[in-house]
Amino acid sequence: LPSHGSEQFSIELRGAYEAIKGLEGYTDQNYIEYSAEAKLMFPRFLAPFLSKSFRRRQTASSELSVSWDMQNRPEFYRRVFSTAWRYRWAEPRHHLNWRIDLLDLNYVYMPWISPTFKNDYLDDADNRNAILRYNYEDLFIMKIGFGITYNNGIDAMRANIETAGNLLNGAAKAFGLKKNGEGQYTLFNIAYAQYAKFDFDYTHLMQFDKRNALALHAGFGIAYPYGNSRVLPFEKRYFSGGDNSVRGWGVRELGPGKFRGTDGRIDFINQTGDLKLDLNAEYRTSLFWKFQGAFFVDAGNIWTLRSYDEQPGGQFKLDEFYKQIAVAYGLGIRLNFDYFILRFDMGMKAINPAYENEQEHWAIIHPRLSRDFAFHFAVGFPF
């Protein structure tokens, strides 16, 4: 909605649904997420510390956003309130877009945790998931970030870096605040996160003719918790598998490393890590009308940077990680309506690092549909 001063106000609503597999002891088996975001965009830099010539750039904008996210899982409910002030500007001649998150505040609130999940995995200090306890408590995240994207239609690149908690940690030490029983500084009795995170994505499109193309993609991410955080916040951790990753696995079903759960119930919650690698190749061809076909090969995994007893085989090691790269292959059907694309991907496991025996590790040689097949529905291309 434009205003008289050329400012623009927008509201965005999103929803997601996931049917969770392999969960026992819970009455609900579904994951539902709703979110709403309001943005007020000014078509100029609102920053007195910048030069007038820089602020006059027509492609620059300042943005104030407020959002609310509601996540309902069988094990817990999570609410995230966020507000941010950021700057964006573009260099069309060089196909570049820049973003600075000057200040991004997030408050993570946990209104409900299932008694089953709480008793089995959070309250028992000897339980193998005790190290993740703080990820299911209320939390503040105060971060700053920088991002750059490049896209000329053939090559696309995206890089982001963010840090959180450094200003709060410096203030806590300067004012001589005391730590809580968990060894953390708090703000209004709520701990704040401290970490650094870097993400990089690159895609190359080889267009053979109007009907056929090959898309190559590589993605890498690494995040390190320190200071006031022993592990990354749940929202900042990496997961593998799903419609935009290694498509032979469902969301959060792969990794870290060669880790494989032993109870078969709740381990997918812990299948997250601090480092992620994705490698993808997808051949795309036009079929008829709005239908397009695809054949893809995906590879990747996630790892932890530290060794956790709770995730054996999950730590990244330079001399072992390449043996833990999962591989999948499959076919896809897409409905391309120009303004949006409906995507149906069917993936099969080819190499499963969670198993060492030949029949399950080399799934491409010994395929089993019930064990190795994954179906994905999504909107838009995977990369």
Range-by-range predicted roles:
Residues 1-4, 29:
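Membrane-proximal, glycine/serine-rich, low-complexity loop/turn segments characteristic
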Residues 299-316, 339, 347-365, 381-383:
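C-terminal beta-signal and adjacent terminal beta-strands/loops
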Residues 335-340, 369-383:
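Outer-membrane beta-barrel "beta-signal"
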Residues 17-22, 73-76, 165-169, 222-228, ...:
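Flexible loop/turn segments at secondary-structure boundaries
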Residues 19-28, 234, 313-318, 325-327, ...:
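Short beta-alpha connecting loops at secondary-structure transitions
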Residues 4-8, 61, 93, 154, ...:
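Strand-connecting loop/turn motifs
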Residues 16, 23-221:
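Transmembrane beta-strand segments of outer-membrane beta-barrel domains in Gram-negative
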Residues 90, 134-332, 375:
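Extended beta-strand-rich architecture
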